[in-house]
Regions:
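Juxtamembrane/disordered regions of integral membrane proteins
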Residues: 1-136
């Protein structure tokens, strides 16, 4: 794939899809009480205002897939790249933007684990989409 515009649109689109699937996983986890069952107070309402920025940021994080590392093992690549948004969520968004403490611990002691799992969903979905699209 030599077309740079196609590369950019593929990784952005894959990241957006990952963001959508991640968001649905977070929402379903809250709706079905899974988050509450593990003591994590994350149960968002599914709305365009909540969903749209998550999809866009998923697309932006998708640009990590332009990096030429771990392409042979796409699932590992997705998991490794999911650490980027995970670290930002735990050390920037929760403490500085949402006022939920470092790593979101005000939301429950297992919040960091939940964030790792939900962002792994993003990374794996984006990686699978790129594999299916024959990007790699």
């Amino acid at each position: 794939m030599d077309n740079p515009t196609r590369k950019l649109s593929m990784v952005f689109g894959a990241g957006c899809l990952g963001g959508l699937v991640n968001s649905l996983a977070v929402w379903l986890s809250g709706m079905y009480g899974i988050s509450a069952a593990i003591g994590v107070k994350i149960a968002p309402q599914l709305s365009a205002a909540w969903l749209y920025p998550r999809i866009v940021w998923g697309g932006i994080w998708g640009f990590l897939f332009l990096l030429p590392i771990l392409r042979r093992n796409f699932l590992t690549q997705g998991l490794i790249f999911s650490l980027g948004p995970t670290l930002v969520q735990l050390f920037v968004v929760f403490p500085m933007k949402a006022n939920k403490g470092i790593m979101g611990l005000d939301l429950g002691s297992l919040t960091p684990l939940a964030v790792v799992v939900f962002n792994a969903v993003w990374g794996v979905m984006a990686a699978i989409w790129l594999r299916w699209s024959k990007y790699h």
